[in-house]
């Protein structure tokens, strides 16, 4: 699942853990513990994970751990994103949460999906009705599945904003 490699032993271990937990009637969050935005590699991960774990009611899909340095439009709908690292600038296609959710649902999987807000899953003001003039903000549309859980990571070093208050407001 990483850099085009399948890591067979690792995947067997993940399968074993998921099967052991879900066979006991418990839940597992399959968390793509990545951040920034959903790349081609991460899209491929979800494509494969849905084939293996789709419709296992005990598996919850955590789409992207901590999105950051993107706006709500990119978060929801994807697009071309320019980034800079030690090698210079590059532009890459990133996938929006709605695109990945649609891919999962189009494969018939109804698993609950977790979507973190922006700025390391801290903010989710973009999900409020009326945000940016949009009737329902950037909320994800899940017409055929078991729903979306919105995830916030409340960090104490960001006192200027209270996501709990915003959650109640939205």
Model feature map: region roles:
Residues 1-20:
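Active-site-adjacent substrate/metal-binding segments within catalytic domains
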Residues 33-37:
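Short glycine/proline-centered loop/turn elements that form peptide/ligand docking sites
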Residues 24-27, 39-60, 64-170:
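Extracellular glycoside hydrolase catalytic/binding regions
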Residues 18-32:
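Substrate-binding cleft of carbohydrate-active enzyme catalytic domains
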């Amino acid at each position: 699942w990483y850099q085009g490699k399948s890591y067979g032993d690792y995947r067997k271990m993940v399968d074993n853990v998921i099967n052991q937990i879900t066979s006991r009637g418990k839940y597992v969050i399959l968390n793509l513990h990545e951040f920034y935005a959903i790349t081609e590699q991460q899209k491929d991960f979800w494509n494969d994970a849905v084939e293996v774990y789709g419709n296992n009611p005990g598996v919850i899909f955590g789409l992207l751990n901590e999105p950051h340095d993107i706006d709500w439009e990119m978060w929801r709908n994807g697009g071309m994103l320019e980034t800079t690292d030690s090698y210079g600038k590059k532009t890459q296609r990133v996938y929006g949460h709605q695109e990945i959710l649609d891919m999962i649902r189009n494969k018939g999987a109804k698993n609950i999906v977790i979507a973190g807000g922006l700025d390391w899953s801290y903010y989710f003001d973009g999900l409020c009705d009326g945000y940016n003039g949009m009737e329902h903000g950037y909320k994800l549309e899940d017409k055929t599945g078991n729903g979306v859980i919105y995830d916030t990571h409340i960090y104490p070093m960001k006192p200027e904003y209270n996501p709990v208050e915003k959650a109640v407001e939205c």
